[in-house]
């Protein structure tokens, strides 16, 4: 193999690498890309999308809510869900697990389950 052929092969490989890395970013997730949420991800999404939306004033004053501080406490979240019925109301005949775990859902669709 001559030097010019070797140089051409290396240049072609480098060009292919640059093209692949620049065009490969088209399939990255955005904030509202639909995704599957199951198990603790449903709880975390509820806390992030639903509770934070209602408590923005408290966060602006630098106070975190007690429920947010005890994020791992599923029993308080269950009590809150029973109190306001957020997870018990069927939406289009489906629950949040059916809608967001078995099928992907966006953040906007998930917010429909906020109380």
From Swiss-Prot:
Localization per record: Secreted
Record's signal peptide: 1-24
UniProt key word Signal: yes
GO molecular function, one term: hormone activity
UniProt record, GO biological process: glucose metabolic process
Modification type 4-carboxyglutamate: residues: 41, 98, 109
InterPro entries (UniProt xref): Insulin-like, Insulin-like_sf, Insulin_CS, Insulin_family
Domain of life, source organism: Eukaryota
Residues bearing PTM Cysteine amide: 114
SUPFAM superfamilies xref list: Insulin-like
Cysteine pairings via disulfide bonds: 38-101, 50-114, 100-105
Propiece span(s): 25-29, 53-94
Modified residue annotations for 4-hydroxyproline: 34, 104
Protein keywords: Amidation, Carbohydrate metabolism, Cleavage on pair of basic residues, Disulfide bond, Gamma-carboxyglutamic acid, Glucose metabolism, Hormone, Hydroxylation, Secreted, Signal, Toxin
Tissue and organ expression note: Expressed by the venom gland.
Any one GO cellular component localisation term in the record: extracellular region
Other known facts: Venom insulins constitute about 1/25 of the total venom of C.geographus.
Record family assignment: Belongs to the insulin family.
Record function comment: This venom insulin, from a fish-hunting cone snail, facilitates prey capture by rapidly inducing hypoglycemic shock. It is one of the smallest known insulin found in nature and lacks the C-terminal segment of the B chain that, in human insulin, mediates engagement of the insulin receptor (INSR) and assembly of the hormone's hexameric storage form. Despite lacking this segment, it both binds and activates human insulin receptor (long isoform (HIR-B)) with a high potency (EC(50)=16.28 nM).
Subunit structure: Heterodimer of A and B chains; disulfide-linked.
Protein's name in the database: Con-Ins G1a
Lineage: Eukaryota, Metazoa, Spiralia, Lophotrochozoa, Mollusca
């Amino acid at each position: 193999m001559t030097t010019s052929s070797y140089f051409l092969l290396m240049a072609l490989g480098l060009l292919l690498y640059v093209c692949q890395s620049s065009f490969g970013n088209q399939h990255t997730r955005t904030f509202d890309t639909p995704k599957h949420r199951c198990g603790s991800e449903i709880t975390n999404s509820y806390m992030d999308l639903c509770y934070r939306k209602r408590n923005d004033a408290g966060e602006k004053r630098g106070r975190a809510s007690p429920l947010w501080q005890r994020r791992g406490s599923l029993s308080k979240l269950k009590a809150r869900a029973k109190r306001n019925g957020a997870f018990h109301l069927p939406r289009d005949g489906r629950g949040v697990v059916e809608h967001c775990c078995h099928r992907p859902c966006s953040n906007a669709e998930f917010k429909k389950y906020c109380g």
